[in-house]
Amino acid sequence: LPPVADRIPQQPLTVDLAALGREPGQHGGEIDILMARGKDTRLMTVYGYARLIGYNPNMALQPDILGSVENKENKAFTLHLRAGHRWSDGHPFTSADFRYFWEDMALNEMLSPFGPPEKLVVNGKPARVEILDELTVRYSWDEPNPYFLPALAGARPLYIYAPAHYLKQFHASYQDQAKLNEEVEFAGVRNWAGLHTRYGHQYKFDNPDLPTLQPWINTTHPPSERFVFERNPYFHRVDTNGLQLPYIDRVLVNIGSAGLIPAKAGAGESDLQARYLRLDNYPFLVEGGERNGFNVHLWKRGVGSQMALYPNLNSVNPAWRALVRDIRFRRALSLAIDREEINQVVYFGLV
């Protein structure tokens, strides 16, 4: 590999760990996590959380992959890329990747039969996409699109770029038809669009050959009982000491039975686990932590409540239908629910 200085952007994103209440680390080591299905590789896209623009711990949006963003009244967004940023295979990440997504994917009837992603459409009108230079792209609409930036920051983000240098080999506009036909037959898909979709799905994270901007790279072809993710040598973040992130060399995703994951986690077979754990697992996980030297944390969730009741407003019984449609009844029902007792009995007094 080239020296680190040649593998990171000219102005990388510097992460101040001390400001986050953490300490700088060192390179090395690996993390074991447990998953139940091969397609759970997509969760590495969630956990890695490299986004064009992302949420910080205070839930404020800030540039991440992007160097900066100009927002004009939620109608025009000018995105500035980081000079020198590269895909995980070392190829430059530029506005050409945004052009490819828009012109060759979003506007292609074979790849996007229903048109561009809905977050790029406002009142039936798609975005105007301007490639201003190698590092600058602008998206604009006649009316405000307040959902654009949050969509880019989502757990399953809105992708508006794709690795053009890799995906063109599967696109009818760039590849010889005879070669495409061979690839289609080998992959067992219906046409070149199916081929392009299979090998180009960034969120699924199941194609080791697909270049990525995430902190770790999938190195394992499915199906497998273990997926190995290795550190991206071209990742765009560094710590305040100049060490390239992430610190961890490898993440090992071990596939097993969903019902056994809480027990395995309690036995210390996972270094970091949230998926497939429930609140009723909490007592024995705490006990397992005391035996095996790990900590169990509770975190706030973005949902309104752990459970919800939905009275049937369309009951066939006219008397019952009239009752539940009366707002006074629904308010009384809400007041009658003993939330504290439910908390103590069902949730161990933790919510």
State what each model feature region is.
Residues 1, 9-12, 21, 35, ...:
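Generic secondary-structure transition motif, activating predominantly at the C-termini of alpha-helices
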Residues 2-73, 197:
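N-terminal lobe/hinge region of extracytoplasmic solute-binding protein
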Residues 117-196:
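Surface-exposed binding/hinge segments that line
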Residues 10-35, 77-87, 92, 166-179:
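N-terminal short leaders/motifs
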Residues 32, 45-48, 52, 179-211:
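Edge beta-strand plus adjacent loop/short-helix module at the start
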Residues 156-161, 165-172, 200-204, 211-216, ...:
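Structured beta-strand-rich cores of soluble
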Residues 54-57, 68-78, 82-117, 122-130, ...:
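Extracytoplasmic/periplasmic ligand-capture domains
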Residues 1, 7-10, 115, 161, ...:
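Selective for proline/serine-rich intrinsically disordered segments
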